[in-house]
């Protein structure tokens, strides 16, 4: 249920953010994406902490860029770091790389100002985590 709520709410927020995100926030997203990619490349389970923190900030930068304070509050209450860390720990290396690629595509969509693309990729990105959460590492 939480994943579905996050997918709906965060995709809505990303669509709004695509039309108004600042260059400073886009730069921050780039920095966070790079930090997650470096941590993911180590293959070290301890890197999950770094990925989890950066991932949480990545998603909140987007939601905050929407300018919808209530939406940010609701999403922050749903995106508990322990749940996200557990999700990442269940990811096979290929799935983790796909998640990192999603982050790059999200940035591209936001930079393009394409609200439909941003909304769709964020929704896909969040829903893709359900496969790992269900205990399978099979790619769809």
Where do the PLM segments sit?
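Conserved amphipathic alpha-helical segments that form helical-bundle/coiled-coil interaction surfaces
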Residues: 5-8, 12-14, 20-88, 100-109, ...
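Active-site loop of classical SDR/Rossmann-like NAD(P)-dependent oxidoreductases
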Residues: 95-96
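Short, charge-rich amphipathic alpha-helical segments embedded
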Residues: 125-140
């Amino acid at each position: 249920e939480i994943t579905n709520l996050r997918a709906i709410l965060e995709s809505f927020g990303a669509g709004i953010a695509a039309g108004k995100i600042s260059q400073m926030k886009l730069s921050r997203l780039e920095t966070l994406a790079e930090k997650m990619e470096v941590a993911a490349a180590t293959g070290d389970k301890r890197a999950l902490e770094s990925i989890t923190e950066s991932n949480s900030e990545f998603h909140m930068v987007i939601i905050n860029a929407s300018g919808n304070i209530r939406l940010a509050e609701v999403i922050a209450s749903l995106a508990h770091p322990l749940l996200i860390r557990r999700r990442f720990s269940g990811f096979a290396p290929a799935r983790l790389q796909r998640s990192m690629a999603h982050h790059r595509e999200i940035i591209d969509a936001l930079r393009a100002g394409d609200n439909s693309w941003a909304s769709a990729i964020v929704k896909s990105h969040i829903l893709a985590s359900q496969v790992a959460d269900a205990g399978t590492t099979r790619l769809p």
